[in-house]
Amino acid sequence: MARFAWRGVALALVVPLAACAGGDPQAGMESAAGVVLRDVPVETASSLPSVVAATRKLGTVMLAEAPADDNVVTSPSSVMVALGMLAEGARGTTLSELEAVLGAAGTRRKDAFAALRGTLLRMDGDPAVVKKDELPDVPVVHLADQVVVDDAYPVAADYLKALAEDFGAGTQKADLASADGKRVLDAWVNHHTGGLIDKSAIEPDPYLKVVLQDAILLAARWETPFLAGGTAPRRFTLTDGTQVSTETMGAAREITYAEVDGWRAARLPYVGGEIYADLILPPSGVDPASVTPELLGKVAAALDKAQPVLLKLLLPSLDIKPEAMKLQPVLAKAGLARLWCDTDPDLTGIGPGGLCVSQAFQRAVLKVDEEGTIAAAVTEIGVSGTSAPAEPELELRFDRPFLMQIASSQTSWPLFLAAIRDPRH
């Protein structure tokens, strides 16, 4: 594998953290002085389970709304954070609809997101780690958020303060109608994904006032690596029944395993045990993207309770880089059809000018090999104005389309959810 967080921000008024641009994506970054990032223990965040369930539900909507003839990689947690940032500036019915999708309202919503993100803080690291030849010895989960404001737009100071306090988001100003503004967005995306995603999906527009950006990057070794000698070309059956050959890893050892309603699943922890990957194989002929949030929840619960069994596991290596996902149909399906500029949302907490969502995208990548996993995603919302072991008796062969979910061990928050229909690379 070419090797390929939560940023605490102690930030009243807006003050510059860096003065000159150059090539630094943080240049020109601003944050609110005197603001301390919200710190909430998991035990006191009463709405955390409902936010996790809502994230799982949104992830299944993302899978279902993506093109049905290709691989899908999503980060439902990243979209939820971006929507949480948008909710800080929403009012009235718009806020109510956002909070229905987010799974919690008011202070409970803020506390849940702070607690969820806080569980990942200790795994933060330099996103450039993915450019090295080897995966890091301990997992890196890097989270970052920012708001880019058009340099002619009077954004509400209270809104920027809320984003800094609740999400650690810094602020940059740029001409969002120009290529210069695009370069600011691109540089931030490239930096916080270690170059895995090199450009923003947002397009310059004279009506664009604010862009919200959320990034997540993961680089983690398997707790027990696959043996390189066990990888070989093996058969994989595509959705249409075509059989192809793809590089497939093999393992025969004790692995946590469960079966739910005909779906078979294995859980592979990463080093340290704070995050894991659930590999989920649907019944033959069933599209993995047809999974329901209820079934995902049942599978997760079953794996939580399951004991390791001696299992022969065959899993394709992956190098998946889908096209950017347009989030408008996803969010409309999820219940947010009235955020857009052909409706009349209330985003007056962000600032004046009859604001509405004009662009929303997610880009994500997923790489899996014998050593571990690298994944990254960026969600952007543009707001416009106007000794030979015993032979296992049980075998789980991922030789047809399947799901892969990466989640926090402590909270089960789904960080990445992918439907693999063709693992060739």
Feature names for model-found ranges:
Residues 2-175:
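Detector for small/aliphatic-rich hydrophobic stretches
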Residues 90-94, 155, 219-223, 275, ...:
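Primarily extracytoplasmic ectodomains and periplasmic/lumenal surface modules that are beta-strand-rich
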Residues 111, 116-278, 308-387:
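Non-catalytic, conformational "gating/processing" segments within enzyme and secreted inhibitor domains
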Residues 275, 282-307:
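Internal alpha/beta scaffold segment
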Residues 98-103, 226-235, 289-298:
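Short Gly/aromatic-enriched secondary-structure transition segments
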Residues 94-98, 286-289, 322-324, 376, ...:
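Extracytoplasmic/secreted cell-surface and envelope-processing proteins
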Residues 359-425:
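C-terminal soluble interaction/assembly domains
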